[in-house]
């Protein structure tokens, strides 16, 4: 076997000594034996043989066979001179320390807010601030009683009231039309998705539309009508593709502040709608045609 497999090293030989073709061949023989003995898988053997044929130094070869059992000779580098080891370890340690100090210096230069790069005590992100996490639980299932009443409460918090021209409520979002306080000829439209977003403005003729309190209806009754609407219209609940509720002013001139609620249901087999008053009184039913 080659000298790096167990024979005494000649004077001046180290892991950095250049490997010869015979050394590479010896390494490949050891790897072949390890494959036959089951120490290496086919993939490990292929990778190591490829590396052995390209090895530059004895150290490169030694690393490829150091964990293998070799009967004819130990597959490891013999002990090198202690002075050479100390020199190599010293250089590695010095390089490591230098890289750490360089990294600390760069990090302090970019992010540091202290007089020294080794002083981390004033990092504001490392100090406890006593702020508790805030978990947001806005209403999402708006066709439920809790979701519907929660939506109206969110409206009061956002605008101070529930006045408006129209409120359209989908299962997980809603839209609201309100008067522009700066110009009563304009309508401000808002969308709710966990919270009321910013307004979009549009010029509309609203002379014949009243501003009403859009919360003045029986929410519990409305939810019950929504849940029974598919069966009311002769549709299967599993066939329903969309459902939404429109709340706007009633057209009856004798009750100017009253609301009219229109519930639209659609499916692949047709759709229909219901119209009812704020107290749940049914005004009209349009069955699927």
Curated annotation (Swiss-Prot):
It is found in: Cell membrane. GO terms for cellular component: plasma membrane. Pfam families: DUF1707. Residues 1-19 form the signal peptide. It is a multi-pass membrane protein. Disulfide bonds: none annotated. It comes from the Bacteria. The chain crosses the membrane at residues 90-110, 257-277. Keywords: Cell membrane, Membrane, Signal, Transmembrane, Transmembrane helix. Its main location: membrane. This is Uncharacterized protein MT0054. It comes from Mycobacterium tuberculosis (strain CDC 1551 / Oshkosh).
């Amino acid at each position: 076997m080659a000298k790096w497999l167990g024979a005494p090293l000649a004077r001046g030989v180290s892991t950095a000594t250049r490997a010869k073709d015979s050394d590479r061949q010896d390494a490949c023989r050891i790897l072949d034996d390890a494959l036959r003995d089951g120490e290496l898988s086919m993939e490990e053997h292929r990778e190591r043989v490829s590396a052995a044929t390209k090895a530059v130094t004895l150290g490169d070869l030694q690393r490829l066979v150091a964990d293998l059992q070799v009967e004819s000779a130990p597959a490891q580098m013999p002990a090198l001179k202690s002075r050479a080891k100390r020199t190599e370890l010293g250089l590695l340690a010095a390089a490591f320390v230098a890289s750490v100090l360089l990294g600390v210096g760069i990090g302090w230069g970019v992010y540091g807010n202290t007089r020294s790069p080794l002083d981390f005590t004033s990092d504001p992100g490392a100090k406890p601030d006593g702020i508790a996490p805030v978990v947001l639980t806005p209403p999402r299932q708006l066709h439920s009683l809790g979701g519907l009443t929660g939506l109206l409460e969110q409206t009061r918090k956002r605008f101070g009231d529930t006045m408006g021209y129209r409120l359209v409520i989908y299962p997980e979002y809603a839209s609201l039309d309100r008067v522009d306080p700066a110009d009563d000829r304009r309508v401000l439209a808002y969308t709710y998705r966990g919270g009321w977003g910013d307004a979009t403005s549009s010029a509309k003729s609203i002379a014949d539309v009243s501003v009403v309190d859009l919360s003045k209806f029986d929410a519990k009754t409305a939810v019950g009508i929504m849940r029974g609407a598919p069966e009311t219209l002769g549709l299967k609940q599993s066939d329903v593709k969309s459902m939404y509720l429109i709340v706007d002013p009633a057209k009856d001139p004798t009750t100017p502040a009253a609301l009219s609620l229109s519930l639209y249901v659609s499916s692949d087999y047709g759709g229909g709608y219901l119209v009812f008053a704020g107290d749940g009184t049914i005004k009209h039913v349009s069955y699927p045609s």
